[in-house]
Amino acid sequence: MWSEFKSFAMRGNIMDLAIGVVIGGAFGKIVTSLVEDIIMPLVGLLLGGLDFSGLAVTFGDAHIKYGSFIQTIVNFFIISFSIFIVIRTIGKLRRKKEAEEEAEEAEETDQQTELLTEIRDLLKQRAPHND
């Protein structure tokens, strides 16, 4: 049973997922700090010193912190946009690399075609003509 678990846990997909979760958590903390420590204070300044995190309304015993909710929405949009930019950049780099590889393959094919044409022409010159 231990060996089955070990082989399951060490499969490539599981390890990739674990690494992704750890990196995602760290990235989330960076973006949260960016939003809470830099962007939201600037937005508050633009809106006359308003601090979203402190916005709340109370109904009896219920304390509704809608400012925290607004901040969470801003976090979501910034994280989503950041991920979009990263994925778009990776896609562009991948397409550029593929285009370079295709151009290289086409060049190799052209060289091969040229060599084969030369070989054919040389063989024609050496072969007796059957006219």
Curated annotation (Swiss-Prot):
Protein name listed in UniProt: Large-conductance mechanosensitive channel
Cellular component aspect of the GO annotation: plasma membrane
One annotated GO molecular function: mechanosensitive monoatomic ion channel activity
Gene: mscL
Superkingdom of this protein's organism: Bacteria
Function of the molecule: Channel that opens in response to stretch forces in the membrane lipid bilayer. May participate in the regulation of osmotic pressure changes within the cell.
Membrane topology: Multi-pass membrane protein
Location(s), subcellular: Cell membrane
Quaternary state and interactors: Homopentamer.
Pfam families registered for this protein in UniProt: MscL
